[in-house]
Structure formats: structure tokens, C-alpha cells
Amino acid sequence: MRALFNITPLVYLFFIPAVSMSLVAREKNLGTIELINTLPIKTHEFVLGKYLASVTLIVAGLVITLVHLFTLIQVGTNIDYGAAICGYFGLALVGAVYASAGTFASSVTDNQVVAFIIAVFIVIVFWLLDKMLIFVPVGLAGFVQFMSVDYHFTNLSRGVIDSRNLIYFASVIGFFLFLTTKNMEVKKWK
């Protein structure tokens, strides 16, 4: 299971921006965003709906990898079920964070390729933060490490559920969804 939990976040660095690049950018490019703005839904409801659609797709892809777990169980491998469940939960949270960043990137532009590039840049920065600690002043090292997605995922992949990790994931998701909503509201009135 450790190999799956090590490689999946790397795949997510490009897969999730590809999934989320068209969430809002396609609506803008096709001109349907004006129609959506006239509907009786609030901007945050629209953003949340787009975000949840991408998270659903990510979780569906994650469910397919359960075949790996069931195969290991069938061949008699000794599996720590707590760590496996926490690892899958952590992968879902990492996917949710990256999807929120991708949703924000998609709201910034009407070009899907540009949205993809912005999203890849954002998620790579969040993934690399704890790997760049040697370049950071000692006083900032703890903060920079705490901002890294990989730092929090590593705890979950080992089977450790810490409230700090859950608060981190919820905060980053909320932050990007808030930015997306505000960005769309500003552009709505332009």
C-alpha cells in the first residue's frame, strides 16, 4: 500500500489540474457564464457545485484503486487496515485540496490550457514546500513545512489522524473556494 500512497500524489499533480481546468474556464470561453449569472443561484453555490463534481470524479478514480487493496488481501498480505483507510482518506483530501486550487485557477482565465498551467504551478508549490526547507530561514521552516500538502498527507498515510491535518485540509479547501467565489463575483459585475 505504501507504493500506492507514494505515487498517487505525484499523479495528482497533473491529473487533478487536467480534471479541473475546464470547470469555470469552459463556461467563460463558451459564453454560458452570462446565462449562469442570470439563474437564481448564488455564486458560491455554483462554485461549490463545480468543485463537488470534480471531487466526485477524483473519489471515483480512487475507488477503482481499491482493487489493489482487495488483491493484497486475497493473496494473504498482512495489511494494517487503519493505515490503509487513513491513507485512502488522505488521498481523497489531497485530491480535494488540488481540486479547489484547480477550480480557482479555472476561474482566473477563460483559457483551459492557461488554467491547467496555473493549477499545476499552484499544486506543485504546495507539494514542494516541505522539500525546500533547506532554502528557508530557520524561523520560517516550521510554517513552510506546515503549509505543505505532502507533510499532512504523510501523517495520514501512516494511519495517524491528527486534528491539525484535518483543519489544514479544510482551511486550504475553504481558502481556494472563497477566492474562486470572490473572483467570480468581481468579474460578474465587470
Stretches found by the model and what they are:
Residues 115-183, 188-190:
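Terminal transmembrane helical anchor/hairpin motif
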Residues 2-6, 11, 52-112:
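Secretory targeting signals
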Residues 23-53:
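Helix-loop-helix units of permease transmembrane domains in multi-pass membrane transporters
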Residues 26, 38, 70-74, 107, ...:
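Transmembrane helix-loop junction
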Residues 3-26:
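Long, hydrophobic alpha-helical segments
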Residues 34-45, 110-114, 181, 185-190:
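Flexible extramembrane loops and terminal tails that flank transmembrane helices
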